[in-house]
């Protein structure tokens, strides 16, 4: 059985030296995991991250070591092989880099997919994009670029696009 996990990462900038700031995950059935990290360098954040992402942080931050441990513990409670779905290749890249910084590799039963590119039907791709925008209109209290909120929006848009609405 494959378990769909929708996720989003926020990170310091769009470069090979980027560090994870926060990550949000939500399963197809609605279980959630969210963490903010404590060991990124704020001065490494680009201006967009400083003005848009950092003001949305509100949880007690944890270390990268605790993040990886907590995430793998949370995932161990879910069934099946995992298909992680994000709306950017950067999310997989930064998650992989975060594990690698601790000398760990992403488990072989974790697969990744970028959406909406995974939809072969152009109508589904359009529906996904429309639903991403509509999510924030329907939930004005939810702000884009908060990792868990974005993961929720991706989940909502993906499931609606997959079902054809």
Predicted regions: what they are:
Residues 26, 100-104, 163:
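Short, surface-exposed basic-aromatic patches at helix termini and helix-loop junctions that form
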Residues 1-3:
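N-terminal accessory regions of nucleic-acid-interacting proteins
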Residues 108-132:
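Short, flexible loop segments at boundaries between secondary-structure elements
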Residues 88, 94, 131-165:
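Acidic, Mg2+-coordinating catalytic module of metal-dependent nucleases/exonucleases
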Residues 90-112:
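Substrate-recognition/cap helix-loop segment adjacent to the acidic, metal-dependent catalytic center
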Residues 5-92:
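Conserved non-catalytic scaffold segment of RNase H-like nuclease domains
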């Amino acid at each position: 059985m494959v378990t769909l996990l929708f996720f989003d990462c926020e990170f310091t900038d769009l470069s090979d030296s980027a560090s994870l700031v926060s990550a949000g995950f939500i399963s197809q059935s609605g279980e959630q995991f969210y963490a903010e990290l404590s060991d990124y360098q704020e001065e490494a954040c680009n201006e967009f991250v400083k003005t848009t992402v950092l003001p949305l942080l509100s949880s007690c931050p944890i270390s990268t070591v605790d993040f990886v441990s907590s995430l793998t513990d949370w995932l161990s409670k879910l069934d099946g092989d995992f298909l992680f779905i994000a709306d950017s290749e950067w999310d997989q890249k930064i998650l992989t880099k975060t594990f690698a910084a601790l000398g760990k590799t992403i488990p072989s039963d974790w697969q990744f997919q970028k959406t909406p590119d995974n939809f072969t039907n152009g109508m589904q791709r359009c529906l996904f994009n429309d639903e991403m925008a509509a999510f924030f209109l329907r939930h004005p209290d939810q702000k884009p670029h908060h990792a868990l909120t974005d993961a929720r929006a991706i989940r909502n848009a993906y499931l609606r696009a997959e079902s054809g609405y």
